[in-house]
Amino acid sequence: MFDLRTKVMIGIASTLLIAAIVLITVVFCLYLKISKALKCAREVESCMDPTKAVSEKMIRGKPIIADPCRPLQCCDNCSLFKDVGAMPPCFCGTNEGL
């Protein structure tokens, strides 16, 4: 009835159609599962005491005790700080290098 080329084309087309239908079905099932899970979570949240839920989710931070900053002594050369490494001479003057 059909030649070999036509049978191959029909086979490929039907395979692609079946694969597309399977993928659409899988995506639709996943969508339904996710929407059902979100709906259940929303219903559970509405039944809970809102102040209790907020306090349970809150993580309290530990206070950080700051060490006093040590004063930096200014050098005469280019008004650099002693603790900082020396800068190249082009950075000493404000107009140098421009």
Curated annotation (Swiss-Prot):
Show the InterPro entries listed in the entry.
FAM24
| Cleaved signal peptide residues | 1-29
GO cellular-component terms in the record?
Answer: extracellular region
State the superkingdom.
Answer: Eukaryota
Localization terms from the record = Secreted
UniProtKB keywords: Secreted, Signal
Task: Say which family it is in.
Answer: Belongs to the FAM24 family.
Q: What is this protein called?
A: Protein FAM24A
Which source organism?
A: Rattus norvegicus
- Report the gene name: Fam24a
